[in-house]
Amino acid sequence: MIQMQSILEVADNSGAKKVMCIKVLGGSHHMVAKLGDVIVVSVKDAIPGGKVKKGDVYKGVIVRTKTGVVRPDGSTIKFDQNALVLLNKQDEPIGTRVFGPVTRELRAKKYVRIMSLAEEVL
């Protein structure tokens, strides 16, 4: 579960490496974000010459969490890190590649584009 001030890795090639959550979108009492939720982030660490710069504010969709997700068959998928993919104003991915695995639950949240860019779908 991701809340305000959480530090996340960036799973795409947009140029950002680490971001910090500054707002969880989705209602006034939405305090934590889970897999597939959209959050507002600030870039804390970026590579030189990338598409994004340190201090920029973007939206992002969470693709991996340490707490994981429980599927209807009872199985649980957990990851070693919290990661997200940065989105532009039109809610499309900024990067052209997604590194690492993503889960099938993104399809239910209408992020098929991220699934097609990912290396592996679990």
Swiss-Prot record:
Record field: transmembrane: none
GO cellular component: cytosolic large ribosomal subunit
Secretion signal span: none
Keywords from the named record: Ribonucleoprotein, Ribosomal protein, RNA-binding, rRNA-binding
A Gene Ontology molecular function term of the record: structural constituent of ribosome
GO biological process: translation
NCBIfam families: rplN_bact
Similarity comment: family membership: Belongs to the universal ribosomal protein uL14 family.
Job of this protein: Binds to 23S rRNA. Forms part of two intersubunit bridges in the 70S ribosome.
Quaternary structure and interacting proteins, as annotated: Part of the 50S ribosomal subunit. Forms a cluster with proteins L3 and L19. In the 70S ribosome, L14 and L19 interact and together make contacts with the 16S rRNA in bridges B5 and B8.
Protein name, per record: Large ribosomal subunit protein uL14
